[in-house]
Amino acid sequence: MIHTLETTVAGRKMKVDFGKTGMLSNAAIFMSYGDTVVMINANASKEPREGIDFFPLSVDYEERLYSVGKIPGGFIKREGKPSDKSILHARSIDRPLRPLFPKGYRNDVQIVNTVLSVEQDNLPEILAINGSSLALCLSSIPFTTPVAAVSVGLVDGEFIINPTVAQRENTILDLTVCATKERVMMVEAGGQEIDEETMYSAIIFGFEECKNIVAFQEEAVAKFGKTKNEPVLYKADEEVEKEVKSFAFDMIKEAMYIMDKDERNAQLDKVKEKISEEFSEKYEDKGADIAEVIYKTQKEIVRNMLLNEDRRPDGRAFDEVRPISCEVGILPRTHGTGLFTRGLTQVMTVATLGALGDVQILDGIAEEESKRYMHHYNFPSYSVGEVRPLRGPGRREIGHGALAERALEPLIPSQEEFPYTIRLVSEVLSSNGSTSQASVCGSTLALLDAGVPIKRPAAGIAMGLITSEDLEKEKVITDIQGIEDFFGDMDFKVAGTEKGITSIQFDTKIKGLSNSCVKDALEGAKKARLHILGKIKECIPEPRKELSKYAPRTEIICIDPEKIRDVIGAGGKVINKIIADTNVKIEIKEDGKIFVTSNNEPEGVKKAISIIEGLTKEVVQGEIYLGKVTKTTNFGAFVEILPGKEGLVHISKLDFARVEKVEDVVSVGDEILVKVTDIDNQGRINLSRKDAIAKKEEEKDK
């Protein structure tokens, strides 16, 4: 039986159909918002997965190009692996949902979001978060707390829920808020240097709207929800937990209080060896339980240290940033480099400049077709002292790269100001917490070193949180290191300039953040960010005045758009010849702007521009030109005065004396000065060498 429920969000209809599709799924819904339609299917394995110490939740976000009436490019003509944007949207769905599953739940859970129809005014990724929550709540899977999501824009000082395309073009804020009816679960934001107070107000504004969508989900669950399965939750054997904890608690505590990370880990390894020696025979088949007890004991000790003893593992104050060092120009042949070190976290970012033709072409469901600025993030195993095969970028690398990219995007100059494609690559050399925000700092250094005229330097910081079991007591921590992230409750990343915030991403391991916690985190992040920006400015206060000698050079000229066809030529013949003759790259825009780029060949750029100017320049009557003789006849000489533009010098106009034979004065290939004496109504150009000489003599006498 098909059931339908409707509600209104931001003046537009949101509709859900149950029982219409996916009859064999645990839960399947067909959800629409305007003309945007997403199908969500949620399923779980019947039994827990053995031998794992994590919750195996899998979220997929599948974009179908037919949803926007497009056929995929390339030879295969079907969708391939998920795009970076699809991966980012899947991560945005995962983060607010994961903390709300029961602790110890080990059943495989898969949520598949398939985008079927897209109206650009209504973002499918926002609909997918709401639909994923609703599908889980309707299913028999033990998920009982609805989560809602909205997008928030800021146009002319007014907050807007789920802005349309026209509104998104004018917004200075792109914010996604996910929340239960009681607390904020997840925030993603990009902004044009938004102040902390405005950002906080925007988050709360979105939170209030989320409550209405949560109420809609609760209504649907009350009417159509399935009975929930009783979950089988993993828990360490009580006897094992009691004995191991009694034996090892003091030793683990002693190790956890060592401030130096390497020394602490070395001591923990010794403790684990002692535990193994003590219990390997008695509990030879309980290795997973023993590992769980060790983890829980470490977590208990660290959290108590932070929450009740006001002490951090490395001895810092709660609002203190780790020691920072900045370097630039460390690689000799690259266009710009920045090495940023904060404690044991170290990132090297390399900037590369290219022609505008080097932009990344996008083939997705969004209206955006290309990217001129991009940031890529690499996290090799050696950065954490581990050994594992090097693969391509995973979801984490793509997510962290996009986060740092978003932090700097509002600061990148326009292509008119800086006509280059910009690629940043952040190499994580050492990781002990918040490498994504270190990438923001490294990227700023690299851009400044490359001579990119960014509006202002940017920096990023990660804030953490420790809460009591009842969530009544909480402490916000500045610049969390690995151990605080691992055992803590929040990773709240904020990047921006001295003027305001350019990006936020936070998620939590608990059932949401209080409003006061959000505010405290924003304020703490600002203080830390300004401190880091001071260190960056000490290293390199402004962009270099000159580009690297190894960087390409680009010049811009503007022509009449009606003349573009003259530059391109039939089948691209003219432009391809210019490129071949001058060894440059040429990009032509519809408005008549032409970008000419060359790698280390400035003469090639000058030559190409000269040719283009000649092709597009109009012949002016009365002007004098230096032309080349292309043909002689018995009645005169034809002279090319601009590329593709010839005129006739009649034999009587060649010289002051009588000329019997044209070849007595000029030959094919000669360069001569000529004056345009007339352009008839058919466009034919009459020239005079005699008048040009006379005019030059007259100017010389003056």
UniProtKB/Swiss-Prot annotation:
SUPFAM superfamilies: Eukaryotic type KH-domain (KH-domain type I), Nucleic acid-binding proteins, Polynucleotide phosphorylase/guanosine pentaphosphate synthase (PNPase/GPSI), domain 3, Ribonuclease PH domain 2-like, Ribosomal protein S5 domain 2-like. It catalyses: RNA(n+1) + phosphate = RNA(n) + a ribonucleoside 5'-diphosphate. It is an enzyme of class 2 (transferase). Pfam families: KH_1 (PF00013), PNPase (PF03726), RNase_PH (PF01138), RNase_PH_C (PF03725), S1 (PF00575). InterPro entries: ExoRNase_PH_dom1 (IPR001247), ExoRNase_PH_dom2 (IPR015847), ExoRNase_PH_dom2_sf (IPR036345), KH_dom (IPR004087), KH_dom_type_1 (IPR004088), KH_dom_type_1_sf (IPR036612), NA-bd_OB-fold (IPR012340), PNPase (IPR012162). Keywords: Cytoplasm, Magnesium, Metal-binding, Nucleotidyltransferase, RNA-binding, Transferase. GO terms for molecular function: 3'-5'-RNA exonuclease activity; magnesium ion binding; polyribonucleotide nucleotidyltransferase activity; RNA binding. Gene3D superfamilies: GHMP Kinase, N-terminal domain, K Homology domain, type 1, Nucleic acid-binding proteins. Coiled coil: none annotated. This is Polyribonucleotide nucleotidyltransferase. It comes from Clostridium botulinum (strain Okra / Type B1). The lineage of its organism: Bacteria, Bacillati, Bacillota, Clostridia, Eubacteriales. The gene is pnp.
